[in-house]
Amino acid sequence: MISRTAMRRRLRRAAMGLSTLAGRPRGLFSPYRHAAGIVRPRGYPELERVFAAAEPEIARVLDAIERHGARLAAFDGPPPAPRWSQSWFPRLDGAAAHALVHERRPRRIVEVGSGHSTRILARAAAEAGGAEITCIDPAPRADIAALPVTLHRRVLCEADLPRFAALEAGDIAFLDSSHLLWPGSDVDMALNRVLPALAPGVLLHLHD
C-alpha cells in the first residue's frame, strides 16, 4: 500500500519527466550507452572505514544532542517554529545541527537549500546567543520569512562565493543543494568552487 505522500511524489516526478521530454526545461537527461551494466552497490567499504575512524567524534555529537534534549523535545510549535512532523530534514539531522550550533557557537552560517533546516538553525542560534544566517534558495521548502535570516532567492552562483570565503574557523557552511552534478550546476559550484575556498576549521554540513 503506497501512501498519499509517496504517490504525490511519484506523480510530480512523472509530470516533470514528461515536461522535459516535451521540451520544457524541467529536468536534465544524459544518455549513457552502458546504462544496462550499472549494478546496485552492495556497500561502500572505504566510506565505512572513514565513519569507523570518526566514531569518537560522532559519540561527542550524540552526547551534545542528549544535553540539549529538553530543547529538542519542545519543537513542533506553530510556524516559523521548527517541527519534527516533516520529511525534508529528518530528526537526527536536525538534532545534530541544533546541537552543533549550541556547542560551537558560530558567528556566521551560510546555508544553501533552506526551509525546515533554517527553522532549526535559527532556533539554535537564538538560544546560543545569535549567529548571522544567510540563506540561498530560490524556493525554500518551508516559510522562513519571519525568521531573522537574510534570504537570497536564487540558485547558488558565483556571486555567493565571497560569503563562503569570509567564513572563519567555527562558522558553518551548510550545503543542501540539488543533487545534479553537471557543469555549471549548483553542485558543481559547491564542490569545485565553495569547498576548496573554505578556511580551515569551518564546519561543513553536506545533506543527502
What are these regions (language model features)?
Residues 1-206:
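A short alpha-helical cap/connector motif
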